[in-house]
Amino acid sequence: GRRIIWLAHESAPKNFTAVDVSDPRKPKVVCQTDLPQSHMRSNSLETCGNIMAVAYQTQKKGLQPAGMELFDISNPEKPKSISFYDCSGPHSRGVHQLWFCDGEYVHMASSSPDFVPTHPSDDQFYRCIDVRNPSKPVELGRWHMPGTKQGDNVMPPPRHPLDKGYRAHNCNVYPQRPDRCYLAYIDGGMFVLDISDKANPKRISEWTRRPSASWKRQDETCPS
C-alpha cells in the first residue's frame, strides 16, 4: 500500500510536508503547506489513521494563531482542516508538543488562555484533549507542576542559575500504558502521571534535579 511520511518544520514559513515513500528509493514530496504567520511554528505533529494533529506555537505570548489544528489526510495531496483548538491568550504561546496515537485523545504540552503562571517562563503544562469528535475538540483534563500557577497553595519552585522554565516540554502516552503520561518538564525534571481518569490526572512519581534541596512542596493539590 501507499506510505506517506508527514514532516513538521522547525520554523516558518513552512507548516508541514507530506512525502510519499512507497518506493523508498524514490521519495516524492506530494504536499507542502505554509504557515499563516511568520511569528509561529509547527514543529510537532502526529497522525492516527486519516487524522493529523498539528501543534502551533507563537514566538511571543498573546499572538495568534496559537493552539492545535486537526486535518483530514485521507487524500495526502489535499489535506483538509477539520477544526482548530484555540489556546491563545495574554500569557500563552500555544502548543509546544503533542502526542496522538489512539485516535481519541491528544496529549499536549500547552499554554491556556486561563492559565496565569507565577513566572513568565512557566507557561506550558499538560493538557488532555478529547478529539473523538474531531470537529469539536474539548479539554478533558490538565495538570501543572504545583507552584507554577498563580493561586496555587504551594510556594513557587526556586529558579535555576540557567533558567529555562518549569514547564512541560514533552508528554508521551504509550499504547501499552494508556493510563500513564510520561511528562518532561524542563527545569522541573520528569513526572509520571496517572491518567486513568483523564479528567483528574494525578502525580505518581517524579525525577528532579532542582537547585535547592531545602525546597519542599507543601501540598500536592492544586486548583485546575
Task: Please identify what each model-predicted range represents.
Residues G1-S224:
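Feature marking well-ordered beta-strand scaffolds used for ligand recognition
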